Amino acid sequence: MTPPNDARITLMNYDDPLEWAQSVTRELENILLQEITQRGRASLLLSGGTTPARVYETLATRPLDWSKIDIGLVDERWLSPQDKDSNAWLVRHTLLEHAKHATFLPLIRPGKTLNQCVHDANLQITHSPPPCAAVLGMGNDGHTASLFPGSLDLPKAISTLQPYVALDATGCPGAGVWPLRITLTPAGLSNIPHRLLLLCGKQKMQVLETALSCKDALDYPIRTAIDLPNARLRVHWCA
């Protein structure tokens, strides 16, 4: 298939999964190095899922000064961070087992309510320098982060000025059996200068093409990342 030529995104396409993972890793490594050089410290937000996991494993082997890097999450399921279905567990076991000196900032705090965790996440991100990069994924339903089409909370999540919100995705197939979420919002993403969308497979490209032609972010929430001003969304797609 022919990838779309759209001025709203910067598209890099690959045929080899290894080349794809190495290219994304190099880009993230360069962003982190530049941020550490300029500010003395860097912060990176990561998504869950099997697609970015390959990149995290590769990034963990890079000779970065991990003691100067904070790792946060784009979104999280309302689960214990120790649960194997949580994004925190995935990041710990793909990246942090090797990059042991990085500081991890999970979204879920044991003993706190969902709303308290959202409050803490907003305090953390608003009282710190903005993350230098965010790694995003996209579901076959067009969701990114935990912004699910069909959620009754989606309109508020898209319009809020808060960086993080709680979202109930009950009834949304893409959310599976974990409807309660904490998610980064478009407002939170807008302050992050480098936004990378990682995609694998022809179906994901078809979804992206449909989203690019769609006019309503409520139908394809990935549009919230595509339509943000300033830096264009950088899409790394492996066929």
From Swiss-Prot:
Function statement: Hydrolysis of 6-phosphogluconolactone to 6-phosphogluconate.
Protein name: 6-phosphogluconolactonase
GO MF annotation list: 6-phosphogluconolactonase activity
Catalytic activity: 6-phospho-D-glucono-1,5-lactone + H2O = 6-phospho-D-gluconate + H(+)
GO BP terms: carbohydrate metabolic process; pentose-phosphate shunt
Family: Belongs to the glucosamine/galactosamine-6-phosphate isomerase family. 6-phosphogluconolactonase subfamily.
Pathway recorded for this protein: Carbohydrate degradation; pentose phosphate pathway; D-ribulose 5-phosphate from D-glucose 6-phosphate (oxidative stage): step 2/3
Swiss-Prot/TrEMBL keywords: Hydrolase
EC number in record: 3.1.1.31
Keyword Hydrolase: yes
Enzyme kind, highest EC tier: hydrolase
Keyword Nuclease: no
Underlying gene: pgl
Matches recorded under Gene3D superfamilies: 3.40.50.1360
Upper lineage: Bacteria, Pseudomonadati, Pseudomonadota, Gammaproteobacteria, Lysobacterales
Domain of life: Bacteria
Native organism: Xylella fastidiosa (strain 9a5c)
Family matches, as InterPro entries: 6-phosphogluconolactonase_DevB, Glc/Gal-6P_isomerase, NagB/RpiA_transferase-like, PGLS
